[in-house]
Curated annotation (Swiss-Prot):
Disulfide bonds: none
Family according to the record: Belongs to the krueppel C2H2-type zinc-finger protein family.
Protein's recorded name: Zinc finger protein 846
Domain KRAB, chain residue ranges per copy: 8-80
Length: 533
């Protein structure tokens, strides 16, 4: 017989069920699954060494307590014999009793016998006993019947090496059944039952039965048998449907032990935990920036490549991420699916609503360690920190002006291009920024959604409310690095620094006189002082 070794994976002949899917099967379905998997597994175990089998089997039994209990005793008995002094399986040993009380006898042929405590069947090689014991897995013993428990299977998916096992045929004393050694298991050979392997015509994977093959074929033809009753979305896997159902029910069973945040899926929790641990396993080869998720890295690499595969069919604008296109499309459709329960304001993205709600609750989670200022958004804190560091990483290629925010650069570039993509449907006025359009629309509606809790004064923009709040708190976050004088607004600081630099950017076109402030120029023009010069 050919003694060459080949790799066979149990995944080739296995049908997977998650714990959730298993609970959905009735007893008849479980019995059928058990019978099919036992047959498949026996074919592979007979080709594997005892230690390899034991490690593989026990590693897969963590979720099946009943099965682990049934198999552990057998493995302990076999361990005892393997540890006996002398050569391995075929050396004579004196009669002794295992911890389970099973008599180990010397055979007439001087070969070591292994006694199964389930049925008294005797085998002359370790792997064959393991194979035979598998047939008992799932049977109900008298002890099992008393407790109402039946042994169930949950076979591990491990790699096994096919090899030729030499020796005499193991024999079942009770049934007088001989267990012959199986031929090499390949895609061309038949199994011991003389049944041909079932082969997938698309990918050439092979399976030992038609039911396994049919389940596998779904991955190719896109069959989606599990349909959501709420929205009609279909899935090929019941576990995926269960996870999707939580979107409708609001159930979030996966809770972070650090902060209590809950998630609908375990993958969401795993990603979130990295925000606490700081783990960022996905690193960009171009710039070294690291990410918590592989998809974030994929999106990031497009910054270097300039690739923008997601194109808007309405205006032709392209995006590096599909989410960017989805959000952008809502500008054209006007869709705002996320509505605030407090004031009724709607948003195109859930994160915008989350941030908006903090205006009502007053919650500010992000605290600046330098000055103690708190922010409702993490991005607000990041931008604020640049006022301390002076960092302005985003520079205009046209004029060299730098900004601490990429969105501010994008808005600034429109000064050079003249682009005004945001147009008012009421009067046709166009704006370079979406916020400018939003503010403008309130001149038509008269809406002032942002109200001061201290004095009741209302504002059309949240930024105006934030600036107004400083009149109550006395906060002056903008300090001059030259003299230390502090100001309530950044514009005041900009004007003040010109007293140190001597810059006068505002020039009168009539007389050529320069001013440090636009208001000083406006006053100069009103008094007609330039006409006298």
């Amino acid at each position: 017989m050919d003694s060459s070794q080949h790799l066979v994976t149990f995944e080739d002949v296995a049908v997977d069920f998650t714990q959730e899917e298993w609970t959905l099967l009735d007893q008849a379905q479980r019995d059928l699954y058990r019978d099919v998997m036992l047959e498949n597994y026996k074919n592979l175990i007979i080709l594997a060494g005892s230690e390899l089998f034991k490690r593989s089997l026990m590693s897969g039994l963590e979720q099946m307590e009943e099965l682990r209990t049934g198999v552990t005793g057998v493995l302990q008995e076999l361990d005892l014999q393997l540890k006996t002094k002398g050569s391995p399986l075929l050396q004579d040993i004196s009669a002794e009793r295992s911890p389970n009380g099973v008599q180990l006898e010397r055979s007439n042929t001087a070969e070591k016998l292994y006694d199964s405590n389930h049925s008294g069947k005797v085998f002359n090689e370790h792997p064959f006993l393991m194979t035979h014991m598998i047939t008992h897995i799932g049977e109900k013993t008298s002890e099992d019947n008393q407790s109402g428990k039946a042994l169930r299977k949950n076979f591990p998916h491990s790699f096994y090496k096919k090899s030729h096992a030499e020796g005499k045929m193991p024999k079942c004393v009770k049934h007088e059944k001989a267990f012959n050694q199986f031929p090499n298991l390949t895609r061309q050979n038949k199994t011991h039952t003389q049944e041909k392997l079932c082969e997938c015509k698309d990918c050439w994977r092979t399976f030992l039965n038609q039911s396994s093959l049919k389940l596998h074929i779904r991955s190719h033809n896109g069959d989606k048998h599990y349909v959501c009753k709420e929205c009609g979305k279909a899935f090929s896997n019941s576990s995926h449907l269960i996870g999707h159902g939580r979107i409708h029910s609001g159930e979030k069973p996966y809770v972070c032990k650090e902060c209590g945040k809950a998630f609908t899926q375990s993958t969401g929790l795993k990603l979130h935990i990295r925000t606490h641990s700081g783990e960022k396993p996905y690193k960009c080869k171009e710039c070294g920036k690291a990410f918590t998720h592989s998809s974030y890295l994929t999106d990031h690499t497009r910054i270097h490549s300039g690739k923008k595969p997601y194109v808007c069919m309405e205006c032709g604008k392209a995006f590096t991420r599909s989410t960017g296109l989805i959000l952008h499309m809502r500008i054209h459709t006007g869709e705002k699916p996320y509505e605030c329960k407090e004031c009724g304001k709607a948003f195109i993205h859930s994160s915008y609503l989350t941030k908006h709600v903090r205006i009502h609750s007053g919650e500010k989670l992000y605290l600046c360690k330098a000055c103690g200022k708190a922010f409702t958004r993490s991005s607000g804190l990041v931008l604020h920190m640049r006022t301390h560091t002076g960092e302005k990483p985003y520079e205009c290629k046209e004029c060299g002006k730098a900004f601490n925010n990429s969105s501010m650069l994008s808005q600034h570039v429109r000064i050079h291009t003249g682009e005004k993509p945001y147009e008012c449907k009421e009067c046709g006025k166009a704006f370079t920024q979406s916020s400018g359009l939003s503010t403008h629309l309130r001149t038509h509606t008269g809406e002032k959604a942002c109200e001061c809790k201290e004095c009741g004064k209302a504002f059309a923009r949240s930024t105006n409310l934030n600036m107004h709040m400083r009149t109550h708190t006395g906060e002056k976050p903008y300090a001059c690095k030259e003299c230390g004088k502090a100001f309530r607004y950044s514009t005041y600081l900009n004007v003040h620094t010109r007293t140190h630099t001597g810059a006068k950017p505002y020039e009168c076109k009539k007389c050529g006189k320069n001013f440090t402030q636009s208001s000083a120029l406006a006053k100069h023009l009103r008094t007609k002082a330039c006409e006298k010069t």
